[in-house]
Structures are given as C-alpha cells and as structure tokens.
C-alpha cells in the first residue's frame, strides 16, 4: 500500500513537471534549450520577463507560486538578463518561517546581490534572527548568506553571533562558522585579529570537516606571518599522518584516496612552514616519503597529491631520498601520453632544477619531445623550462629555438615575453660579440615595436660602455660589428620604428669612429632613413641628431664638411616643419655647421654618450654674479615660500590619522522607552538671579564686580529672537548695543550687563528686521505705562553712546541716605522672557508692595495697581508733552523715601501670580481696550 502511495506521488509530481515545479517552467527550460540562435533565446527570455513582471504585481500570490517565480528569476539571471525588478521579492522570502522558502530566498539573494548592493541592509536583521534559530538548517542557511553577502561595514552586526556558533553542537554549523570568520578575515583583518586563536582551537575539532575548513584560514595567516605558526608544524604533520593511515571516516574518501583535498591543503601549509627551516624539514621528510609510496598514480587525484608533494619538496630544505622519489614521479609524468601529466612533469622538473640541476639531464629526450609537441600550452611550458636550464654551453641552441618559436606565433603578449627572455639570455651568456649583435638584430627585426623600450636603451648603453672588461679593442670590435650589421639591415624595406631608432643612434655615435666608413656615406644612409620613414617623427628626429653628431665629429677633427644635397634639402624641409621638435633640431644642426672646431668639440665631445652629467640644482656657478649684483644695490632673492608667508603646519595636526569613524551603522536593537518624568524647573543652563537693589552710594564699587560676575554666568542671548507667543509689542533694542547701565527712575540697572559685556560692537547687521509698531499702539502703551515708556525712550535715545567716566564717578560720590530703591513698573505688554538681574535675598513681593504704597503717595507717577481695578480707562489722547512731564516728575519723585501703607483694591500677590500665568501661557489681548487685563486676570 505504501509503495502505491509513493508511485502516486511521483506520478503527481510528473504531471506537474517534476520536482514540484509547474509544467510552464519546464516548458520554458525546454524552449530555451531548443533555441537555434541567440536572438531566439533572447526573445523567449524577454517574453518571460514581461510575464513575471505582471505576475509578481498580483495580490495574494501563494507561497508555492512565489517560490517558483523566484526560481525562474534565478534562471533568467543565469542566462545573462536583468531580473532586478524581482530582487525585493527574494529578500522578502528570506523572512518566511517555512524552511524550504527561506532557503530558496537565501539562495536567490546570494545569486542576485553582491556585498555592495543597497538591499543588503534589509537582510541583516533577518540573518541575526536566523543565527539564533533552534533549527540548525536555518542557521546554516544564514551562515551561507554571510559568506557571500556580508561586507566590511556589516561585519560587526553578526560577528558576536558567529563566534558563539563556533561551539555549536552540530558540526555543520561549526564548519560554516569557520568559513564565515575566514571571509571576515579576508574582508577586514582588523575586525577578527583578536579571534585568530579560535582557528587554532578548531584545528583540534573532533569532526574532520571542521578541521579541514580551519586549514583554509590558517593557510592565509601562515602566508602572511610564517614565524608565528612554526609551533604547529608537528600538529600538521600528525594530521597528515592520520589521514594517510586512513583513520578518517570512509565518507571522506575520494576515488579510494583518503581525504585528498585535506592532504593537498596540508602539503601547501607544510611547504610554507618548512622553507629555510631544517628542523621543520626533517619532521616533514618521513610523512612525505610515505606519501610517495602510498599514492596511487593511476588516478588523477593521486597524481595531484604527487604533484603537490613535488612542490613541497622543492620549497623545503633538500633531502636526497625525497629528491630521488620526486625525480621518479616526474619521469612517470613525462612518459605519460596525457598532455596534462606531461605539463605537470615539466613544471615539477623546472622546480627541482633550482635544487639539483643534474636532474634535467636525465630527461633530455622527454623535454625535446615536449618542445616539438603540437600542444601550444605544453610547448610554452617547455620553453619556460629551457629558460631555467640555460647556461653558456647551450645558450645558442636554446635562444635560436626560442626565436624560431617567436617568429611562428601571433600572440603579441607572449611574443613580447619571449623577446625579453632572448635579450636577457643573450646579455648573460653571449659567447661572442658578433653573436650577441645578431641575436639582438633578430629580436628587433621580428618582434618589432613589441620589444620594451628599455631593452633598446639597454642595448645602446651596452654598445656604448662595452661588456665592462676594460678591453678597448673588444669594445671597438663590438661597435664595428654593430655598425656593419646595421648598414646591411638599413636597406630592408620595412623595419620597426624602435629598431630604426637604435640603428640611427649607433650610426651617429660610431659610424665614422674607426675610419672605415666616410661621413658622406653614413650621412647619405641616414638621409635615406629619414626620407623612407617621413611619417615617423621620432625616427626623423633620431636621424637628424645622428647627422648632427657626424658633422660635429668631422668639424672637431679639423676636416672639411661637405653637406650632401639630400641632407641640405632635408634640413630645409625640417626648418619649415609643423613639428617644433624637428624644427628645433634642424636649427641646431644649421647653427652647428657655422661654429668653429673648438666650440663644436665642447658641445658634442667624441664618445661621451655615457658620461655622467652632474646637474647643479643650486646654480652655484652664479654665486659670484649674485654677490656682485647685491653689492651694486640689487635686492636679494626672496623665495616663493617666504613671499607667501606660508609655513608648514603639519606639526599641529594629530599624528594618528587612522581614527575609528564615529559615524557608522548601528545594528543593535533600540532601547525600550523609559517612563516619562514630569519636568522640573532647572536653572543649570540659564540661571536667572533674583533682582537686587543697591543704593547709589555703593553702586561704583559693585558695578565692576557685578559686571564680571554676570559676564561669567551662562545666559541666553534673546536679542533679535522672534517671540512665538503674544501680539508683537515694543521691545528695547539697545540691550546688545551698549554695555553702559541705563538709569530708570533714578536707579542704574544692570539687567543687560551679562550680555552687553561680551561684545561692545553693535549687532545690527546680524539681527533680523523688527516688525513695525503701530503708532497708535505706542501711544496707548505710553499712556498706560509711563515709567516703562520713559525707560524705553531713554534707552533708544542713548543707545550706542557710552557716558564719560568722570560723570559716572561724580554721580557715584553724591551721598544718599535712607533711600529705598524702587523697581520700575512692569511692562505688562511684554510677554517675552524676563531680563536677568542681580541676585538678592530680598522678597520681591515686599518690594512691589512698597512700590504700590509709594505710587499712591506720589502724584507724578502712574498708579500701576489701578490697572487691575474697575477705574475708568485712560484716554488715548494724552499728549506727548504731558507724557514727558510725567516722566520727569516720576524720575524726580523717586528719590523720596516711601513709607509702607495699607494697600487698597485686589490682593497684590494674586494679581502678580495671575500676571505671571498670563506671561507663561501667552494669552493675546483681544482688543486695544485698556480693560483687557480685566478679562485676563479676572
């Protein structure tokens, strides 16, 4: 019965298309596979893209359908088309709780996105959540995504959780955690520098898979610093020995070879640790010998391990037995019919030649067979081996074979490499000068402009300086052979430009040196070169310079110079050339022909091309001229640095330029909101001292102290700040423009000293334009609050002018007895912040009670408390003259002593509390009627 159910499920899957996919998807794959052209394939894929764009926009797509759509998007991307419109759906699928859908989403995301994509930030939180999952398959899926997508900026978000997973109970999770840390080390070594010890610990893991994964990061670490891991040599050797003895589970075997990939990685690590270390090499020798005996050379994986053993032996200190075993393995490789094994044999032979050159002689015939093999890759590898085998006895044969091969190939890159190797071998092992010149001529002739220009310069320097044996005859023969060979080649129809430059330079320097060839003959050849390659300005420039040298040597030797007609026509042509370089060379040649022998010999000495030229950067030869000019009254030279007045400021910069950036992405969770605390009054930022009143007799002494104390306190600058609450009202504008205390009602106030003392310059250019005040409102305010208006007018009239010191001191010395300072009447229309005054211990309410009593006695001052009574409103037609008279009377009357009296009307404290509440809440008056305060205060 169960078998029938299984068959039924398989038939159902087959009807759907197999593997849970729809028949529509399989038809898509089939149609693309049967496409006969790239255009037909593109048409099918673009049609599928249009279908998916419409399908993905449909609402309430079933998860099974969405999974199929994501797989189809992956298939479209694999074919090289853009499916970026569906990336976000793959990201959303990683959030699904279903394991199959989540893994599908992670697979698609790792294929769609790269580490710098903008959508990476959207899956970081999902990865963090999945790393904490109880299902180890979900954790593995998240770790796979980390190994592909996490960049340097997002490493700190997942690093702590990955480190915790190193101790997970599942070996698959531990293995993938090691792989994730390896990626972190490659992307940002500094982020995991403190976690390197974890790699050492996981090397001893019970699971071979975790241990094998640890070898990869350890290989990178050892490549960077070998000495720090010398203590692990015995551990690696022990692990390799256990692997070769088949102590690992059978599941790690590959083609009956025990854990071959772990063996290969261990051999690479041992090659690094044993380089130049005799003790480490001795420890490794035994297990390496066992590998040569146990490896099966009949399989590719066995040959791979043998090849890695040969590489390891070539790196550590030599051991005769190991070298013999390696030579036998190489012999098997070279005798094989497989080109791959021959290639491995040639490469291994090239490595062992450095240790024992005699090994190559045992395989001469095999090397020649590889050199004649039609496989181009094998032939190139053989030439690399010949290059390493070259010495004086075989240099001619090897270089000739290399030049023949260079002529036969069309690969410019490899042709350039072969040419440079031929030049290098000819310079090191040339048996004669003539052979050297011939080889160089062949290289330049056939490689042409592919030869590096440094090779041409080195050749010219070698011809000029000789072989450095202080043998002038040998050097002369070398130059003569070069001139003769170049005169033969110069008639060739097509020569490379670089070779022509070398020919022109050599003929100009040494064409007439031995007297075998006349100047007219050499100059004629050079003119032919310039005429044949008229489109190449560089060659023509070298030819003109060579003519200049030939004529200079003739003039310096005292011989008569006969300029050939073709040379004269060439000079005339170049004098009118569009090239400034050729024109300059022609003018110099023309001027040189008119000089005498002594001048020419000084300008162009014979065979001085390699003489060292000392450049006097300080122009010390002008010191005498400069001193003479200064003595004659000339101004000394001032350097540009001294003129600009700039100095080095590097000492003032911090030395550590590698500061950790303070602005970075934060991936930790937000803090929970704290319960709200009712605000409390605080005076830490803006302390507002209580008002104090000093007698005029003590004012001069305390003024400076108060100013200094207030200037040191922290205060807000409210001048020029637009008020948010209340109707626009008239405000004083001189608080910031003057630091002189202003007198109000006969008493000097220092409410603005803290602000004004910080700056004595007016801030009108920085303050915003104040709104214009209606004149009717000004008259109303003046009629209601005479004292405040007088103070405002007085400040505005005297703002920006500082009174003389003598006047202030004189006023301060007038004795005043039993005077009680009076607070100016409050400006109830000012709903702004109160101005700061000097702190005092007096009760402000008692002071205001005294103010009311004095106001009731003084007929010249306005009754402030009467505003809160039911008295008739004051008319707004009060004249300005009467207002000024009231101000003068109030200022005079304030000097009298006031006696406290019983106040009439409403309670003073209640009225002030209401007034303070109104100031705080910012209630706007509804009309210009003076009884508005009755509405506000009740």
Swiss-Prot record:
Repeat keyword on record: yes
Basic and acidic residues composition-biased segments: 764-779
GO cellular component, one term: AP-4 adaptor complex
Keywords: Coated pit, Golgi apparatus, Membrane, Protein transport, Repeat, Transport
Function: Subunit of novel type of clathrin- or non-clathrin-associated protein coat involved in targeting proteins from the trans-Golgi network (TGN) to the endosomal-lysosomal system.
Record region (Disordered): 690-712, 725-867, 880-912, 919-938
InterPro entries in the record: Adaptor_Complx_Large_Subunit, AP4_complex_esu, ARM-like, ARM-type_fold, Clathrin/coatomer_adapt-like_N
SUPFAM superfamilies noted in UniProt: ARM repeat (SSF48371)
Ranges annotated as biased composition (Low complexity): 728-744, 853-863, 880-891
Subunit and interaction comment: Adaptor protein complex 4 (AP-4) is a heterotetramer composed of two large adaptins (epsilon-type subunit and beta-type subunit), a medium adaptin (mu-type subunit) and a small adaptin (sigma-type subunit).
Name assigned to this protein: AP-4 complex subunit epsilon
One example of a Gene Ontology biological process annotation: intracellular protein transport
């Amino acid at each position: 019965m169960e078998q029938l159910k299984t068959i039924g499920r398989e038939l159902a899957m087959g009807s759907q298309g197999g593997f849970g996919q729809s028949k529509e998807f399989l038809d898509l794959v089939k149609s693309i596979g049967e496409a006969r052209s790239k255009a037909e394939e593109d048409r099918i894929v673009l049609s599928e893209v249009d279908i998916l764009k419409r399908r993905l926009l449909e609402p309430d797509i079933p998860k099974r359908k969405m999974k199929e759509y994501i797989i189809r998007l992956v298939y479209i991307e694999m074919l090289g088309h853009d499916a970026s419109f569906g990336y976000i759906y793959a990201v959303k699928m990683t959030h699904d709780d279903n394991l199959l859908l989540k893994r599908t989403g992670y697979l698609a995301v790792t294929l769609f996105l790269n580490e710098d994509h903008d959508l990476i930030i959207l899956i970081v939180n999902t990865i963090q959540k999945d790393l904490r999952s109880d299902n180890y398959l979900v954790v593995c899926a998240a770790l796979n995504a980390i190994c592909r997508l996490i960049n340097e900026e997002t490493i700190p978000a997942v690093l702590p959780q990955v480190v915790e997973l190193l101790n997970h109970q599942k070996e698959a999770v531990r293995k993938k955690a090691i792989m994730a840390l390896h990626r972190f080390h490659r992307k940002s070594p500094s982020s995991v520098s403190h976690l390197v010890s974890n790699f050492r610990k996981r090397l001893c893991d019970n699971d071979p898979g975790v241990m094998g994964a640890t070898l990869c990061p350890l290989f990178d670490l050892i490549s960077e610093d070998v000495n720090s891991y010398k203590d692990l040599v015995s551990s690696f050797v022990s692990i390799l020995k256990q692997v070769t003895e088949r102590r690992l589970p059978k599941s790690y075997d590959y083609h009956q070879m025990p854990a071959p990939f772990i063996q290969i990685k261990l051999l690479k690590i041992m090659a690094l640790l044993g380089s130049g270390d005799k003790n480490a090499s001795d420890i490794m020798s035994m297990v390496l010998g066992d590998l040569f005996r146990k490896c099966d050379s009949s399989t590719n994986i066995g040959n791979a391990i043998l090849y890695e053993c040969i590489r390891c032996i070539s790196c550590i200190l030599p051991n005769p037995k190991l070298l013999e075993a390696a030579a036998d393995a190489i012999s098997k490789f070279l005798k094989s019919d497989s080109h791959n094994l021959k290639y491995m044999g040639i490469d291994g032979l090239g490595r062992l030649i450095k240790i024992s050159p005699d090994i190559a002689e045992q395989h001469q015939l095999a090397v020649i067979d590889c050199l004649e093999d039609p496989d181009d890759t094998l032939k190139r590898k053989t030439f690399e081996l010949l290059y390493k085998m070259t010495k004086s006895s075989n240099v001619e044969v090897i270089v000739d074979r290399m030049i023949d091969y260079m002529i036969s190939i069309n690969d410019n890159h490899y042709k350039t490499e072969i040419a440079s190797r031929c030049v290098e071998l000819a310079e090191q092992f040339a048996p004669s000068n003539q052979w050297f010149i011939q080889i160089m001529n062949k290289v330049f002739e056939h490689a042409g402009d592919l030869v590096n220009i440094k090779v041409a310069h080195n050749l010219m320097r070698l011809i000029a300086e000789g072989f450095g044996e202080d043998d002038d005859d040998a050097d002369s023969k070398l130059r003569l052979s070069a001139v003769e060979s170049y005169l033969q080649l110069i008639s060739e129809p097509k020569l490379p430009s670089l070779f022509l430059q070398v020919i022109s330079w050599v003929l100009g320097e040494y064409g007439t040196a031995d007297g075998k060839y006349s100047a007219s003959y050499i100059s004629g050849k050079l003119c032919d070169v310039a005429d044949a390659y008229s489109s190449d300005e560089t060659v023509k420039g070298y030819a003109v310079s060579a003519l200049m040298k030939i004529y200079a040597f003739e003039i310096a030797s005292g011989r008569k110079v006969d300029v050939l007609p073709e040379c004269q026509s060439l000079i005339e042509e170049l004098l009118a050339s569009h090239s400034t370089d050729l024109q300059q060379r022609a003018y110099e040649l023309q001027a040189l022909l008119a000089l005498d022998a002594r001048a020419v010999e000084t300008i162009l000495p014979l065979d001085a091309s390699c003489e060292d030229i000392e450049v006097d950067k300080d122009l010390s030869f002008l010191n005498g001229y400069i001193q003479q000019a200064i003595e004659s009254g000339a101004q000394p030279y001032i350097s540009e640095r001294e003129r600009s007045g700039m100095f080095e400021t590097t000492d003032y910069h911090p030395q550590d330029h590698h500061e950790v950036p303070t602005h970075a992405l934060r991936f930790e969770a937000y803090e929970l909101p704290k319960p709200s605390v009712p605000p409390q009054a605080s005076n830490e930022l803006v302390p507002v001292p209580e008002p104090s009143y000093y007698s005029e007799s003590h004012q001069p002494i305390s003024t400076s102290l108060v100013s200094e104390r207030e200037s040191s306190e922290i205060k807000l600058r409210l001048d020029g700040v637009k008020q948010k609450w209340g109707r626009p009202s008239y405000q004083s504008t001189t608080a910031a423009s003057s630091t002189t205390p202003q007198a109000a009602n006969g008493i000097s106030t220092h409410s603005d000293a803290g602000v004004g003392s910080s700056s004595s310059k007016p801030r009108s250019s920085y303050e915003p334009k104040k709104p214009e005040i209606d004149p009717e409102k000004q008259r109303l305010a003046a009629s209601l609050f005479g004292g405040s208006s007088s103070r405002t007018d007085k400040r505005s009239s005297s703002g920006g002018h500082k009174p003389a010191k003598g006047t202030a001191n004189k006023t301060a010395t007038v004795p005043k007895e039993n005077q009680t300072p009076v607070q100016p009447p409050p400006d109830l229309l000012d709903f702004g912040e109160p101005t700061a005054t000097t702190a005092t211990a007096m009760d402000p309410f008692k002071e205001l009670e005294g103010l009311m009593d004095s106001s009731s006695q003084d007929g010249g001052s306005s009754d402030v408390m009467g505003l809160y009574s039911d008295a008739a409103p004051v008319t707004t037609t009060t004249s300005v003259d009467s207002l000024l008279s009231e101000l003068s009377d109030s200022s005079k009357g304030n000097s009298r002593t006031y006696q406290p009296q019983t106040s009439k009307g409403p309670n003073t404290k209640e009225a002030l509390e209401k007034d303070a509440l109104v100031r705080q809440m910012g209630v706007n008056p509804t009309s210009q009627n003076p009884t508005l305060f009755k509405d506000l205060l009740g």
